Amino acid sequence: MGEINRRNFLKVSILGAAAAAVASASAVKGMVSPLVADAADIVAPITETSEFPYKVDAKYQRYNSLKNFFEKTFDPEANKTPIKFHYDDVSKITGKKDTGKDLPTLNAERLGIKGRPATHTETSILFHTQHLGAMLTQRHNETGWTGLDEALNAGAWAVEFDYSGFNATGGGPGSVIPLYPINPMTNEIANEPVMVPGLYNWDNIDVESVRQQGQQWKFESKEEASKIVKKATRLLGADLVGIAPYDERWTYSTWGRKIYKPCKMPNGRTKYLPWDLPKMLSGGGVEVFGHAKFEPDWEKYAGFKPKSVIVFVLEEDYEAIRTSPSVISSATVGKSYSNMAEVAYKIAVFLRKLGYYAAPCGNDTGISVPMAVQAGLGEAGRNGLLITQKFGPRHRIAKVYTDLELAPDKPRKFGVREFCRLCKKCADACPAQAISHEKDPKVLQPEDCEVAENPYTEKWHLDSNRCGSFWAYNGSPCSNCVAVCSWNKVETWNHDVARIATQIPLLQDAARKFDEWFGYNGPVNPDERLESGYVQNMVKDFWNNPESIKQ
């Protein structure tokens, strides 16, 4: 069949399948699967571009990491005035009930505060205290928030909290962790910890030893180096990997490390924390200790200037994410954060043993999403997350900076941006109404942004203060915007249907409905997800199914 005839045949086939979907979703699923991947490549081909695919205004300035929602928490100034949303009432924009506007008052009441909303710091520390298990959530007796669920969550986050340096919130340079020394002669563990480097360790002393011994590994080309590094990265635990050139635009303008102080815990042990937990639990209010600030000087803190960035993705569990906003969904996020540090550390050791400098990083040091876009791993979605072709937004990103010159990958476009314009499911599913309902992304101006957003780049507006306020109310991270995303599927043919739908006018209005016809996602409305019993049923399914659903 000629290419033109083949294209027309496949277009007609997919249109026919879509029309039949209204009558019989299950029949269509079987009919579409053999055709859809081929059709998608013709109707909506995947393309590569040599340039960064989104507009960046000449006024753009590098992002200050201490402005993000979680790092701002530890600025004492953020504890002086009530948390502020960019829009006080989004119902005027969306025409729907604003389910997030009362969260600051509800969070204040949870802290025993009456007569005013919670501050930014109070909001975030309320979340952290529940998330660490030091305070019960208000749903602690409900399915999805029980002691069993909380124990799984604690185990999943353990490496991130105990060995990574709590870099999920940001930070840099590198990470530090408090560890309790042990007397090897008596096996006694000290009550007072000492601060040591965490897994995001920038100690490159081994590199000079390798070079001085003449043992630096020489690659035949940048292309060979990239091939080898990608293979090693996958073996060491990454699910997806790409190479980005070092682009200073994405390096934070300020690095910061939370200041830890000793807090005496009820068990008699001293724990180093960036807020006064005993004071809070005794009703004395919320107190944070600020930041140590660092200029982003690579040579001073890591010993080198980066040339390349190895960006990798770790999949999150599909069944666990379906339970959002339960604690089970937090557990798979925590597992990925813990694994990010482990995998990044192993990649760094691999590079150092070859004689190349490396700086392993999680959310710290630089903005991960644009680097992942440059590395060809996906597109930026309406929800502000990287949408990959394989996992959608159901993943976490980490990176390793290096002075090894690698052949970079190119940004790829496979229909995400176009689909996000039409879909808006993540915005509808957000309990805090933190995600923009505007159809098109735009180059945000300062007046379009809340304090944690960086203006002068093309994207959809996100209000992290709203998002964080729901996390505090929920007592656990929320992944609704990931769970309902049409790209969050384990059968990738659905992704191809989404690509096609954006290109055929007859299908565009139905773009977000394909996966709903096929029974995915559950309710989009955040209240209905809980009140219908959907989340509770997904939690029961999670515990009752011994095997995880894999891509």
From Swiss-Prot:
Domain of life, source organism: Bacteria
Residues annotated for [4Fe-4S] cluster 2 binding in this entry: 430, 467, 478, 481
Induction line: Coexpressed with pceB.
A Pfam family of this chain: Fer4_16
Membrane topology: Peripheral membrane protein
Residue ranges of domain 4Fe-4S ferredoxin-type in the record: 411-440, 478-496
Organism: Desulfitobacterium hafniense
Protein name per Swiss-Prot or TrEMBL: Tetrachloroethene reductive dehalogenase
Protein's UniProt keywords contain Repeat: yes
Keyword presence, rRNA-binding: no
PANTHER family: IRON-SULFUR CLUSTER-BINDING PROTEIN, IRON-SULFUR CLUSTER-BINDING PROTEIN-RELATED
Swiss-Prot/TrEMBL keywords: 4Fe-4S, Cell membrane, Iron, Iron-sulfur, Membrane, Metal-binding, Oxidoreductase, Repeat, Signal
Enzyme class: oxidoreductase
